[in-house]
Amino acid sequence: MLFRSQPNTEIYIIGHTDSTGTDAINNPLSVARANSVRDYLAVRGADTRLIRTEGRGSREPIASNATDSGRAANRRVEIFLAERAVAQR
């Protein structure tokens, strides 16, 4: 997997929900969604010290919440990879 061959890569995982339900439900759900992906990667050898998770609830839809397909698209996790800066001496 990528994280084994790229030890200086940080992984950012962001969970999202659709707009069904309240923020009190969606915000923790989006965090749990991101943490689930983190746990999946950890079991497969990812260094959890290099993984950051965040939940954004329903605040950043990529599709309309007025349709089933739009709501399904909004229930997602995004993964971003970034090379960690290495201090030079």
Cite the ranges covered by each PLM segment.
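Short, small-residue-biased leader/transition segments that mark boundaries at the very start
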Residues: M1-L2
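Amphipathic, soluble alpha-helical interaction motifs
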Residues: S5-Q6, Y40
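Periplasmic OmpA-like peptidoglycan-binding domain that tethers envelope proteins to the cell wall
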Residues: I14-R89
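Short phosphate-binding/catalytic loops that engage adenosine nucleotides
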Residues: Q6-T9, A46
